[in-house]
A protein has these predicted regions:
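Bacterial N-terminal signal peptides
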Residues: 2-12
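Bacterial signal peptide processing site
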Residues: 14-15, 19-20
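N-terminal "mature-domain start" segment
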Residues: 26-51, 96
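Short small/polar-residue motifs
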Residues: 45-53, 119-126
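Mature extracytoplasmic domains of secretory-pathway proteins
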Residues: 45-48, 54-110
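Extracytosolic low-complexity repeat regions of secreted or lipid-anchored proteins
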Residues: 84-143
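Active-site-adjacent structural elements in enzyme catalytic domains
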Residues: 146
């Protein structure tokens, strides 16, 4: 039996029943790719967004983690379309985004803020952002089952 660490919890997982995939985004990510991933996580990424990477875990959590960077000027509109209450963001990782691994690096963020939102069908959306750089906002998205 293997152990998978997701969102700070150790989850037992049979090798056959749980599949983890992580990949760095290809150099040329199309707008169609971003739209598809956006639909999967419930967030409309702007055309200016750059996909940094995607990680999926199939199994008990059916988790997807996505890191995107977008121009700071596009952040307010993106946030207004997200299914979260912006006033609920709090400083720090708070156990919502899990450990750093490869492209996934919320613990290296200069000014990380996070929020958790309950979604229909027992799903959860954890959203974090780092606006510590003047012109770019890094967005960390984790969608998983409760």
């Amino acid at each position: 039996m293997a152990m998978v660490v997701a969102i700070g919890l150790a989850i037992p997982c049979e090798n056959v029943a749980c599949k983890s995939t992580a990949k760095q985004a290809p150099r040329q990510t199309t707008q169609q790719d971003l739209e598809s991933i956006g639909k999967e996580v419930g967030l409309p990424f702007p055309p200016s967004a750059k996909l940094i990477g995607v990680h999926r875990e199939r199994g008990a959590d059916d988790l997807i983690a996505v890191k995107v960077e977008l121009p700071a000027k596009d952040w307010p509109v993106f946030l207004s379309l997200a299914p979260v209450d912006a006033s609920l963001f709090r400083a720090g990782e708070r156990g919502l985004l899990g450990p750093d691994q490869g492209f996934w690096d919320p613990h290296k963020a200069q000014n990380l803020r996070t929020v958790e939102a309950s979604l229909p069908n027992g799903r959860v959306l954890n959203l974090g952002y780092d606006d510590g750089r003047a012109s770019v906002v890094a967005v960390y998205v984790v969608k998983h089952s409760k």
